[in-house]
Design a protein with these regions (language model features):
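Core alpha/beta structural scaffold of self-assembling particle/tube/pore-forming proteins
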Residues: 1-59, 75-408
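N-terminal amphipathic/basic membrane-interacting segments and domains
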Residues: 61-62, 71
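Glycine-rich loop at the start of a catalytic domain that most often binds anionic cofactors/ligands
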Residues: 67
Length: 408
């Protein structure tokens, strides 16, 4: 019998009210959560107005053979730095908290999820800052790198970007000194572009070569590795980097490919300059440089694979896959690929000499209510705030980098 256009079958569409939706468990996040550098640094207490301590820079003069020598006092420099403030915040409606108190009401309890996400956001932002240029900069717009999509929406091509600095949903400022807010709505790692939406009422128009900053962070970040391991002039922690025993060790590859020989050369030259055996104990590769070096080491098997644990006791359950690269004379060094390191670079450090200084009250703000939920005075909602006070200590003499490597 021929079917009629008036007929219907029992189907998902015609009787959809009879069917249930099988809600699955809350899914794994699909974005960068690595906190490699933070995990490898010792946490030291920060108290007082600023940190101030002496650092010896040479021997006490007065040695000789055969007769009494002339004498000279040892040379010292004063290390000084002040704390900075970093925050992560979110608002939660009180009604939403109440309606999500059980598994029947929601996938996750809103007492827990925002706190988890805030801690997650803070960890990412801290990792970004620790690898950064000390001034809050995320990147720079390339020449002819602005496409106006209309309505305050722009697609920006980035100049030699560190894509890990950009995440959808984060807010940024564009151009030095400008405070208009833009939301990052899309990130394309393959094309090195981001799409941003300007906040309502703002007037800033992005232009080529403009610098992009994390919101309200221009010149407010802690000291970062990209700054300290590339300094060739000026001061670092109140000490001139012109001093031989204070500036970092650097090697420009001038677009050549990294090789085991170059890697070993950099380690040995730093050791020779500093005068300490195994001056570095840890290095982080841009992904392209790690790929190039491992391709050459594969045949010789001059490395071991290990699980790199965290020095931070709070992260004792966290580990990353790393390799220990064996080199003549310079010994072995732990190496790991890191998204926050530019593709053309390799960064070196002695983690025993570096540290994070943080105030005891850093963390969730709980003084007002005894919980992380801070009551809003004018609205039926709570604010959750994570506050961190402190500074990063990266003495340049304990740092190094190989830069300008081939990325093709």
């Amino acid at each position: 019998m021929a079917s009629s256009s008036l007929e219907t079958s029992f189907s998902l569409t015609s009787v959809s009210e009879l069917f249930k939706t099988d809600f699955k468990s809350y899914q794994q996040a699909v974005y960068n959560e690595d906190i490699i550098l933070w995990s490898q640094l010792e946490k030291r207490p920060y108290t007082g107005k600023e940190q101030d301590f002496p650092k010896p820079f040479d021997y006490s003069g007065g040695v000789s053979s055969g007769s009494l020598p002339k004498k000279k006092a040892a040379g010292y420099e004063k290390i000084k730095f002040s704390s900075i403030k970093m925050y992560a915040m979110a608002d939660v409606e009180r009604e939403a908290v109440a309606l999500s108190m059980s598994d029947k009401g929601a996938f996750v309890r809103l007492m827990e999820e925002p706190m988890k996400k805030i801690r997650e956001s803070f960890a990412w932002n801290m990792e970004r800052a620790l690898h950064g240029t000390s001034d809050g900069k995320l990147g720079t717009i390339a020449t002819s790198g602005v496409t106006d999509n209309g309505g305050g929406n722009y697609t920006l091509t980035l100049s030699t970007p560190v894509i890990a600095n950009f995440e959808e949903g984060m807010f940024c400022n564009i151009e030095t000194g400008n405070t208009d807010l833009f939301e990052i709505t899309a990130v394309d790692p393959d094309l090195s572009t981001i799409t941003v939406q300007r906040e309502s009422g703002a007037t800033q128009v992005p232009a080529q070569t403009d610098e992009i900053f994390m919101q309200q962070s221009e010149d407010n970040d802690p000291y970062g590795l990209a700054d300290m391991n590339s300094k060739t002039s000026g001061n670092a922690y109140n000490v001139s980097t012109a001093l031989r025993k204070w500036h970092s060790s650097q090697l420009n590859l001038s677009s050549k490919s990294i090789t085991p020989q170059i890697f070993t050369q950099h380690l040995l030259r730093h050791e020779k300059r500093v005068g300490k055996k195994k001056g570095f104990n840890f290095c982080m590769f841009g992904y392209t440089q790690m790929e190039k070096l491992m391709n050459q080491l594969e045949d010789s098997k001059a490395y071991d694979c290990i699980k790199l644990g965290a020095k931070d006791k709070a992260l004792a359950h966290v580990s990353w896959d790393a390799v220990v690269i064996h080199t003549p004379n310079a010994g072995s060094i732990t190496a790991i690929a890191n998204r926050f390191v530019p593709d053309s670079e390799v960064w070196f450090m002695n983690t025993d000499e570096c540290a994070i200084y943080e105030a005891p009250k850093s963390g969730f703000v709980t003084e007002d209510t005894g919980t992380p939920l801070l009551r809003s005075q004018d609205e039926d909602k709570f604010e959750i705030r994570w506050a961190w006070y402190g500074q990063a200590y990266f003495p340049p003499i304990s740092l190094g980098r190989i830069y300008g490597g081939s990325v093709t």
